[in-house]
């Protein structure tokens, strides 16, 4: 089974287009290409109840922790750096042969 490459990479600024965090802009912390999901900072926060565990020094850690959960890539769009609006991603090959991502709306390089 082959894994499709994601057009959204770590460090990109994206906007959430559906769900409870719709309209929120954030930076991609991590990409999961095998699941087609991305982790966006400050978005899709969930609450986890962790069990209290003894550490080596005798301190206890546990309780209620809030953290980000991955979001499917179809629910986010990359933000165009030229005007700050969401756009689709295209590809162009430069004169030197390198493949670069471009904004479909403005044609600017991402």
Swiss-Prot record:
One of its GO terms (biological process) is translation. Keywords: Ribonucleoprotein, Ribosomal protein, RNA-binding, rRNA-binding. GO terms for cellular component: ribonucleoprotein complex; ribosome. GO terms for molecular function: rRNA binding; structural constituent of ribosome. SMART domains: KOW. It comes from the Bacteria. PROSITE patterns: RIBOSOMAL_L24. Belongs to the universal ribosomal protein uL24 family. One of two assembly initiator proteins, it binds directly to the 5'-end of the 23S rRNA, where it nucleates assembly of the 50S subunit. One of the proteins that surrounds the polypeptide exit tunnel on the outside of the subunit. Part of the 50S ribosomal subunit. This is Large ribosomal subunit protein uL24. It comes from Frankia alni (strain DSM 45986 / CECT 9034 / ACN14a).
């Amino acid at each position: 089974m082959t894994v499709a490459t994601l057009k959204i990479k770590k460090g990109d600024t994206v906007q959430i287009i559906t769900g409870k965090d719709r309209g929120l802009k954030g930076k991609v912390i991590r990409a999961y290409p095998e699941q087609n999901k991305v982790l966006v900072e400050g978005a899709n926060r969930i609450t986890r109840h962790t069990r209290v565990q003894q550490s080596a020094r005798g301190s206890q850690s546990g309780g209620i922790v809030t953290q980000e959960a991955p979001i499917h890539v179809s629910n986010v769009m990359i933000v165009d750096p030229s005007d700050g609006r969401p756009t689709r991603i295209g590809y162009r090959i430069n004169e030197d042969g390198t493949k670069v991502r471009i904004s479909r709306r403005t044609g600017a390089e991402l």
